[in-house]
Amino acid sequence: MWLALIPLAYAPILFAFIKEKPEDVEANENNETKNDFKASSIEGGFTLQQTLMSANFWFLSVMAFCTFYSILAMIGHVFLMLDGEGYSPQISATGVSIIFIGGFIGKVISGKLAEMIGRKIVLVGGVAMMLLGSLLIVSSIFYKNPLLIWIGLTLYGTGWGGLYTLIQLLVADLFGLIAIGKIMGVINVIDTIGGGLGPIITAVIYDSTQNYLM
């Protein structure tokens, strides 16, 4: 389980490098690059080609890859992990539902919070919730306490739901609306690859170690 969560732990590093808006990107580029990267606005923004040259795009894409890897690895294996640790099938199955309920809550409240305290803060908070949730889930195995499972899975799902929404908001903020459909399409391909690898790699790790806590 620890190895499966490594990509999630890497995600906060990315946020330190994400600029708040296109003007911040331009401030650090030379004059030639400035001519190519124009400030994003509601009426315009970056083209897909310009976006693919932006470090912000790749930071967001790697973050999306990591979070989808982690959430789908958790969804795919939480039942097996809890069942293998001696929890009843009812508790193990309920764990999956809690993740989705938390995800719904995160998606609903993250947009409002982003308007109140800023998108980047909410984004970092979402990752922190996922990390804290994963620690509580691991602790529940050692202490055999179902309450830790419920809290941990709720935090995990809520954090992911918030991240899912904030990625889309940040794309609009950073790159504008002129090519937002194409940009989100590329990011969705990347996060889908991460989501597809999550359950598979976690299964390979478990098969080789016979332990989710490695």
Q: What feature does the model see in each segment?
A:
Residues 20-45:
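Flexible cytoplasmic inter-helical loops of multi-pass small-molecule transporters
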Residues 49-112, 198, 202:
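Extracytoplasmic gate region of multi-pass secondary transporters
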Residues 2-16, 214:
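Symmetry-related core transmembrane helices of the 12-TM Major Facilitator Superfamily/SLC fold
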Residues 144-155:
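Paired small-residue
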Residues 174-209:
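A late C-terminal transmembrane helix in Major Facilitator Superfamily
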Residues 128-142:
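C-terminal ends and interior cores of transmembrane alpha-helices
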Residues 116-127:
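Cytoplasmic membrane-interface "Motif A"-like loop-to-helix N-cap segments
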Residues 162-175:
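Intracellular juxtamembrane helix-capping segments at the cytosolic ends
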